[in-house]
């Protein structure tokens, strides 16, 4: 039996003789010499044929079902192609429908041609021609839908290079010219034969040599240093035809550094190992014998040969290349060659030996030994060496100060070590076994500190984290320790009143002993204009009694200004309205560490009970200062007008800034009030916290130190609503509140400290939310002031940076320039502020440049190009003007917009902004035109009034004939002045003739005509 395996199928067959063997056996039996043998071979042959037929029928029946089942796959595989996958697996890949259609079309064409050929009549072919007519015989073919082909013809043109053919002489001439060009320009030459040979021309001892690149120059020591075939050798011989090749070298002239030099062996005096008599390529010397690079040497000899390479040049080349790659690209100066190159080499060697000491810079053992050394070993062995090198540089090369500084710092870093092992041991002994916090943090810090100079950056970060945990633990522990009960807290008012030197100076008091504000009175209007309301006495005081706050209400005693002559009724006014009573608690105190900060606490009596506020009587037009001590009454800066001012709801803390103004010098009052209005109040907003208010006071105290001892107005503490009330001159009808002890600005600033433990830091104080600056409104104000000298003068003095808003419109800028406002601003500020004078001068120059542009877009381009220059000139710090930050933001926006537009234009994008300046100019130009028309109208009216007055005065004394002549002269004069023709009496209508007293008729409209008639009418 025999077994055949097909995949997972196993077939068992009877042993049979193959057909070929049976035939061979039958032939052998039919030979003559075997005819007498028995007929046994016939039986064998028949048996073999029977077995073979049985086997073939069994095989066919076994595969028949499988072939029928796999017939669709075989049909599809007919058009598939074989591909090899990633790991060598070969498989079939299905073809696309387009490919199958192409194959079927090709088969159909071939079959049709074959049938046409077979079905055609027999004929003798005399000539062969192509019949374009379609044959009558059609072969059935599958229906194929032809799709249109969208193929773009390739525009690529095939370039056919002309073959270069040169004669031997031309080739020799060509190579000589290549050699001459390489020698003149110092270029490399590559000779490509069986192997590539690279060479270049070099000069040594005033002789020119051709030098090939040999393998030992790369650091290896091969047996063959260079391999040349015969063709390459001939070309190399032609390139080596130099002065050095023909030079007769004496003994010892071939020295190190000449590796790869091509010389004539016939001109060498030294003993040498010759490869041939045509060339000698220097490799080195072995046992006083020069060795050719082409000679084969043993491995032992290759290590013993003294190679004539130039390690110094290799080091120099590597150093130069690396230095050029790593050098600073951005420097603030132009680098020059000031230091001697040779001395630079000396110092570089000293630095190299100081950082990495070694016997040879190429020694691998020295490098490995240094890399295996610990930092302590390096410190012990080389710190003295570094100090010696530092002294050498100091004595011999003092001009290398930067190297000296580096060595000094490097030596100091190496010596950083912690030798206090006793402290480390004691800490470990005391708390080393304790793993809970904070002892775990202490142990970790102890382990890190003992490292000393070996601490890494990560160690420093870890030590800081553990130290922070210790600080947090200590802070929490300190807060949790109670040093005593709050019942023992006492904070009495000082028996001594605070002395305010500003209110005692005779130079600042008038004859009645009242404080004189001086220039401070004018600048204080910024507070009253924005943060105070004028009390209308005719409406009574009742509407001002209740003051609302975000957390409750407080009643003022302003109603007590109306007093009764009845003593009993008058005594009732001394009674206030009680608030909720609060005992002394933690909310009343402030601590820093374990100690109370008494000026930031509420006032108490001797027995520890809180000092509660009583009714505070009102006054008229006074500023009351002196919080916990005796109050001092100062007349308000606006008392002369007789009006009464009351703070708007929510901004009573402005009284604190008004009290600080008393201590401000008169020449600084303007800056102080503008700083408060423009910088601090917008940041504080409505109802700021006491911490924010104290921070603002600290900001002012830094700028104006004389305000530190300024007295505070009375401040009441409402613990129920958690609000501070700054009491003004109208007092307080609400009673029972606590009183803050802080009496000066310096004491109030303590609330700004983060280390102060106080709940009162978060209490609210009065404030105000001011409107943000509107650019469009300010530009309209600037336009309105162009032809109004009084408004322009106020703008120039109080808000000079408002002039910079003219850059938003070329028309506004030109109007400012033409009206003379910029010149006037320059003359005003030239003696007061050089920076503002420079800005106005720049605006004048910019207006002159804008006037040269013919279109609006060109004018805006001129302004945009100068926005960056204006921004750099304007933005020089903080200025006490409300318009300053608005001008800075405007210029900054224009600068950024210009830079981005330039980038877009460079990239080829269009900017839509070119259409917007026309809209802005259209919006602003009517304002300028209207102002100018009003000025012209006023001028016409004044001119008419003058002419009418003159005519009325002089015509009374004239004769009637002279009077008519005078009227004609006046008409002519008026037409010359106003540039408007006047109708003669002959041209007038009958109605106008009856009104012969009318001098001229303007043409500005019927309303203006009527007004002019009323102004210019007079009788003849």
UniProtKB/Swiss-Prot annotation:
The N-terminus of helper component proteinase is involved in interaction with stylets. The central part is involved in interaction with virions and the C-terminus is involved in cell-to cell movement of the virus. Pfam families: Peptidase_C6, Peptidase_S30, Potyvirid-P3. The active site is at 216 (for p1 proteinase activity), 225 (for p1 proteinase activity), 259 (for p1 proteinase activity), 652 (for helper component proteinase activity), 725 (for helper component proteinase activity). A motif (Involved in virions binding and aphid transmission) lies at residues 618-620. A motif (Involved in interaction with stylet and aphid transmission) lies at residues 360-363. Gene3D superfamilies: Helper component proteinase. This is P3N-PIPO polyprotein. PROSITE patterns: HC_PRO_CPD (PS51744), PV_P1_PRO (PS51871). Keywords: Host cell junction, Host-virus interaction, Hydrolase, Inhibition of host innate immune response by virus, Protease, Serine protease, Suppressor of RNA silencing, Transport, Viral immunoevasion, Viral movement protein. It is an enzyme of class 3 (hydrolase). Residues 165-308 form the Peptidase S30 domain. The record marks 308-309, 766-767 as: Cleavage. Belongs to the potyviridae P3N-PIPO polyprotein family. Residues 644-766 form the Peptidase C6 domain. GO terms for molecular function: cysteine-type endopeptidase activity; serine-type peptidase activity.
């Amino acid at each position: 039996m025999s077994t055949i395996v097909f995949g997972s199928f196993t077939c068992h067959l009877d042993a049979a003789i193959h057909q070929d063997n049976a035939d061979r056996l039958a032939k052998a039996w039919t030979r003559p010499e075997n005819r007498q043998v028995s007929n046994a071979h016939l039986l064998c042959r028949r048996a073999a044929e029977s077995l073979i037929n049985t086997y073939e029928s069994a095989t066919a029946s076994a595969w028949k079902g499988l072939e029928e089942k796999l017939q669709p796959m075989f049909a599809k595989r007919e058009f598939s192609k074989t591909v090899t996958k990633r790991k060598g697996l070969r498989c079939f890949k299905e073809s696309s429908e387009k490919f199958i259609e192409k194959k079927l079309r090709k088969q159909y064409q071939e079959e049709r041609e074959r049938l046409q050929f077979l079905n055609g009549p027999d004929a003798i072919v005399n000539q062969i021609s192509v019949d374009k007519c379609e044959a009558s015989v059609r072969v059935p073919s599958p229906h194929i839908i032809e799709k249109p082909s969208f193929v773009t013809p390739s525009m690529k043109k095939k370039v056919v290079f002309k073959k270069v053919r040169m004669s031997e002489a031309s080739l020799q001439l060509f190579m000589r010219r290549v050699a001459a060009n390489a020698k003149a320009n110092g270029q490399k030459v590559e000779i490509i034969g069986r192997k590539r040979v690279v060479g270049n021309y070099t000069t040594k001892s005033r002789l020119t040599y051709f030098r090939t690149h040999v393998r030992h120059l790369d650091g290896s020591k091969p047996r063959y240093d260079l391999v040349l075939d015969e063709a390459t050798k001939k070309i190399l011989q032609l390139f080596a035809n130099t002065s050095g090749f023909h030079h007769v070298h004496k003994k010892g002239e071939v020295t190190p550094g000449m590796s790869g030099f091509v010389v004539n062996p016939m001109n060498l005096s030294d003993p040498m190992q010759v490869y041939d008599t045509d060339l000698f390529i220097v490799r080195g010397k072995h046992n006083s014998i020069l060795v050719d690079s082409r000679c084969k040497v043993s491995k032992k000899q290759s290590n013993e040969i003294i190679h004539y390479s130039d390690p110094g040049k290799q080091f120099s080349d590597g150093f130069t290349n690396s230095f050029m790659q790593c050098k600073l690209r951005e420097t603030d100066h132009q680098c020059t060659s000031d230091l001697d190159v040779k001395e630079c080499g000396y110092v570089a060697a000293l630095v190299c030996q100081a950082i990495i000491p070694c016997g040879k810079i190429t020694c691998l053992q020295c490098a490995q030994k240094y890399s295996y050394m610990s930092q302590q070993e390096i410190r012990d062995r080389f710190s003295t060496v570094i100090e010696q090198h530092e002294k050498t540089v100091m004595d011999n090369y003092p001009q290398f100060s930067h190297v000296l500084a580096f060595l000094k710092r490097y030596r100091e870093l190496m010596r950083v070590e912690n030798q206090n092992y006793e402290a480390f041991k004691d800490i470990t002994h005391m708390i080393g076994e304790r793993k809970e916090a904070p002892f775990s943090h202490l142990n970790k810090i102890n382990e890190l500190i003992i490292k000393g100079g070996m601490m890494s950056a990560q160690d420093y970060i870890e030590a800081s984290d553990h130290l922070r945990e210790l600080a947090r633990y200590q802070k929490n522990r300190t807060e949790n320790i109670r040093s005593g009960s709050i019942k023992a807290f006492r904070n009495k008012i000082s028996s001594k009143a605070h002395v305010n030197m500003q209110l005692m100076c005779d130079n600042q008091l008038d004859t009645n002993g009242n404080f004189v504000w001086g220039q401070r009175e004018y600048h204080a209007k910024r507070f009253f204009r924005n943060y105070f309301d004028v009390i209308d006495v005719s409406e009574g005081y009742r509407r001002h009694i209740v003051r609302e706050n975000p957390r409750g209400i407080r009643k003022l005693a302003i109603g007590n200004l109306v007093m009764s002559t009845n003593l009993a009724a008058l005594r009732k006014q001394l009674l206030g309205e009680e608030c909720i009573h609060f005992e002394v608690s933690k909310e009343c105190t402030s601590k820093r560490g374990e100690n109370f900060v008494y000026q930031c606490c509420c006032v108490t009596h001797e027995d520890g009970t809180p000092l509660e506020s009583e009714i505070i009587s009102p006054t008229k037009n006074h500023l009351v200062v002196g919080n916990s001590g005796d109050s001092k009454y100062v007349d308000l800066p606006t008392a002369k007008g007789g009006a009464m001012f009351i703070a708007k709801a929510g901004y009573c803390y402005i009284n604190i800034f008004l009290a600080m103004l008393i201590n401000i010098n008169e020449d600084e009052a303007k800056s102080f009030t503008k700083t408060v209005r423009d910088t601090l109040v917008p940041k504080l907003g409505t109802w700021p916290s006491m911490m924010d208010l104290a921070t603002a006071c600290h900001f002012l105290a830094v700028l104006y130190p004389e305000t530190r001892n300024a007295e505070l107005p009375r401040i009441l503490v409402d613990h129920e609503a958690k609000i501070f009330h700054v009491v003004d001159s109208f007092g307080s009808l609400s009673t029972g509140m606590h009183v803050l002890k802080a009496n000066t600005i310096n004491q109030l600033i303590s609330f700004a400290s983060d280390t102060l433990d106080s709940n009162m830091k978060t209490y609210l104080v009065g404030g105000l939310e001011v409107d943000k600056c509107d650019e469009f409104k300010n530009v309209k104000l600037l336009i309105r002031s162009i032809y109004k000298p009084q408004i322009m003068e106020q703008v120039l003095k109080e808000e000079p940076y408002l002039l910079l808003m003219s850059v938003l419109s070329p028309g506004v800028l030109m109007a400012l320039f033409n009206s003379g406002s910029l010149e006037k601003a320059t003359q005003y500020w030239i003696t007061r502020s050089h920076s503002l004078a420079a800005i106005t001068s720049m605006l004048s120059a910019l207006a002159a440049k804008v006037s040269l542009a013919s279109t609006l877009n060109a004018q805006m381009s001129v302004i945009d190009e100068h926005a960056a220059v204006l921004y750099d000139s304007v933005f020089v710090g903080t200025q006490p003007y409300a318009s300053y930050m608005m001008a800075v933001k405007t210029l900054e926006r224009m600068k950024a917009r210009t830079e981005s537009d330039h980038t877009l234009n460079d990239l080829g994008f269009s900017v839509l902004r070119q259409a917007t300046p026309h809209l802005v100019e259209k919006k602003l130009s009517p304002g300028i035109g209207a102002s100018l028309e009003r000025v012209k109208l006023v001028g016409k009216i004044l001119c008419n009034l003058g002419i009418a007055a003159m005519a009325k005065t002089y015509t009374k004394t004239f004769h009637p004939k002279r009077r008519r002549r005078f009227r004609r002269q006046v008409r002519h004069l008026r037409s010359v002045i106003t540039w408007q023709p006047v109708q003669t009496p002959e041209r007038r209508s009958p109605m106008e003739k009856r009104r012969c007293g009318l001098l001229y008729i303007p043409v500005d409209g019927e309303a203006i005509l009527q007004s002019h008639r009323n102004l210019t009418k007079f009788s003849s």
